[in-house]
Curated annotation (Swiss-Prot):
Pfam families: IPPT. Belongs to the IPP transferase family. The record marks 101, 123 as: Interaction with substrate tRNA. Monomer. This is tRNA dimethylallyltransferase. Catalyzes the transfer of a dimethylallyl group onto the adenine at position 37 in tRNAs that read codons beginning with uridine, leading to the formation of N6-(dimethylallyl)adenosine (i(6)A). Its EC number is 2.5.1.75. Residues 35-38 are annotated as: Interaction with substrate tRNA. One of its GO terms (biological process) is tRNA modification. The keyword Iron-sulfur does not apply.
Length: 308
């Protein structure tokens, strides 16, 4: 059976969770989260996880599954998500992928190759080389695998090192190996609204995070875990950690959270516009819910017919 996955994405703060709750009133759905930070336990406020009431209304998967200091990547996400997807279908429910992490979306719709084992020696050498000559790894990637370089952000050292590791270990480009693992068809629904409205929602959400206890959440985390973890470089956490370290005041920290979140939302939209056949809706428009319910129902009916 050729499964057509349903993905609902959009910039942070646009209202994906709120819309999903509304859709659940019409369809028997379960959500597979596509948020690379909501997978971590104890990081609730700063990652804007669904609240207990929303989680009660709609079953969510891939939230609170690992500790902040545990290793996780897009390959593991893809593997776990597909198993959960099968279980949801067996229960007669509709699996809906929801979130804005581009790497997870790529893992599902483009495939994500991870067959080459990690080589810590190569990784250490590459990291050392990068420290000695900043920017050299980017140049190497552009030379060895231009296609991968075009997809990987210049500041994304994790993916840069992984791509170079695969090439140095196998002599093959990771971009070519990934093409061997193409995923099935998908329907990508993108939520977006007027930029001024989106930015205002982001600003208000940042203030509410502080009101709801983000500072205490960060304090508890860095008491239990190393504050230099990559996990804590997440927007909202890194700024509060710097505030707690006395680098700047709370007002500046809040300003930076707002600004950095707006910049992140803009990058998400740039990424999502690459998908030519995506379907875009404004979640604030009254007819949006009905249209998306129709789309999901159509895919689900098609799936049911294929099973018959």
């Amino acid at each position: 059976m050729n499964l057509k996955r349903i993905i609902i994405s959009g910039p942070t703060g646009v209202g994906k969770t709120d819309l999903i709750v509304e859709i659940s009133k019409n369809l028997p759905i379960e959500v597979i989260s596509m948020d690379s930070r909501q997978i971590y336990k104890y990081m609730d406020i700063g990652t804007a996880k669904p609240d207990p009431y929303q989680l009660m209304l709609v079953k969510h998967h891939m939230i609170d599954i690992i500790e902040p200091n545990e290793y996780f990547n897009a390959f593991l996400y893809q593997k776990m998500a597909k198993e959960i997807e099968k279980e949801i279908l067996l229960r007669g429910k509709i699996p809906i992928y929801v979130g804005g992490t581009g790497l997870y979306i790529d893992a599902l719709v483009k495939g994500f190759f991870e067959g080459v084992p990690r080589d810590e020696n190569i990784r250490k050498e590459l990291s050392k080389l990068n420290e000695q000559e900043p920017g050299i790894l980017r140049k190497m990637l552009e030379e060895f695998d231009p296609e991968a370089a075009s997809r990987i952000h210049p500041q994304d050292m994790k993916r840069t090192i992984r791509a170079l590791e695969v090439y140095l270990k196998t002599g093959k480009r990771i971009s070519e190996l990934q093409k061997q693992d193409k995923s099935d068809d998908f329907v990508l629904i993108v939520l977006n609204t007027d930029r001024n409205i989106l930015y205002e929602r982001i600003n208000i959400r940042a203030e509410k995070m502080i009101e709801h206890g983000l500072i205490d959440e960060v304090k508890e985390l860095i008491e239990k875990y190393d504050k230099t973890l990559d996990t804590f470089k997440t927007i909202g956490y890194r700024e509060i950690i710097d505030y707690l370290d006395g680098i700047y005041g709370l007002e500046t920290a809040i300003h930076l959270i707002k600004r950095n979140t707006r910049h992140y939302a803009r990058r998400q939209l740039i990424y999502l516009r690459r998908f030519k056949n995506s379907l875009w809706f404004d979640p604030l428009h009254s007819e949006t819910k009905e249209k998306i319910v129709e789309i999901i129902s159509g895919v689900y009916n098609e799936l049911s017919q294929k099973k018959e």
